Swiss-Prot record:
Keyword terms of this UniProt record: ATP-binding, Cell membrane, Membrane, Mitochondrion, Mitochondrion outer membrane, Nucleotide-binding, Peroxisome, Phosphoprotein, Postsynaptic cell membrane, Synapse, Translocase, Transmembrane, Transmembrane helix
Name of encoding gene: ATAD1
Family: Belongs to the AAA ATPase family. MSP1 subfamily.
Side of membrane Cytoplasmic, spans: 33-361
Species lineage: Eukaryota, Metazoa, Chordata, Craniata, Vertebrata
Protein name: Outer mitochondrial transmembrane helix translocase
Amino acid sequence: MVHAETFSRPLSRNEVVGLIFRLTIFGAVTYFTIKWMVDAIDPTRKQKVEAQKQAEKLMKQIGVKNVKLSEYEMSIAAHLVDPLNMHVTWSDIAGLDDVITDLKDTVILPIKKKHLFENSRLLQPPKGVLLYGPPGCGKTLIAKATAKEAGCRFINLQPSTLTDKWYGESQKLAAAVFSLAIKLQPSIIFIDEIDSFLRNRSSSDHEATAMMKAQFMSLWDGLDTDHSCQVIVMGATNRPQDLDSAIMRRMPTRFHINQPALKQREAILKLILKNENVDRHVDLLEVAQETDGFSGSDLKEMCRDAALLCVREYVNSTSEESHDEDEIRPVQQQDLHRAIEKMKKSKDAAFQNVLTHVCLD
């Protein structure tokens, strides 16, 4: 018969240590098992790990040291662009001299000469800048050139970065955008096609999307309370009318990037063809007169088509053995005329397609 005293006796020191050891092993195995299961069912785990590695690499490239980042800030940091790796300068942008001058005065100067304006609230850089106008007119180029000239860290924010399947994660990512930008200031948060992200709110918006937008705007407002903060949200859009009125209020500095006029088109053509093999008799003013309604990207594509005509003629007129001996002839006026006609037909066809869809709707 077992006496009751046997069950009530105190554990020995070795038994206590053994029990603690077994509980520790059990807890560790349970933790890592659950963690492995969560990682296994998360389809974005691999992308998150790769994003973290990319973020750490970028942070080293831009010379950021002794700055601790959270998991969410690391996800945003993967979209950092090193200003030294941005090969866009003002000299790469033609026909927008007035816009460039205004940007230098209102955005770049207050950042580069901060000590001159620290006692004035009126002369601080704006917290929001909107670039709007037709597609292909250089809005993204201007944003990159602004960041490079001002020496700002450039966060190329994609709206998809802020969406997460877990409830509440999108708000944390939105908060990480601003906390990271503040840690890395001076910095520019650039949102291309901002109308797709911060468009007019309506009752049909998903709850998570509405909460994320509200969080984003609330944090954006926080930049205004700290006048020494050098964080700028810069957006580009083709449809400013679709932007929420609250967003427009937060972007008081706006620049209309319109389609280039005659002199602007001539300047753009000179820039595009500056280092190309072009016949000296080509009249770029005449080409500019024939390209009314062309955007900057249209002009570049037109020049590319003209150069390809020379390449195609060279390939068709020579044998494989003589390719190394001959040279491709320079681009001539007639090549540019043919490329213009091709581009006009393409634009007309696209316009007719749009009209057809409108009529069907």
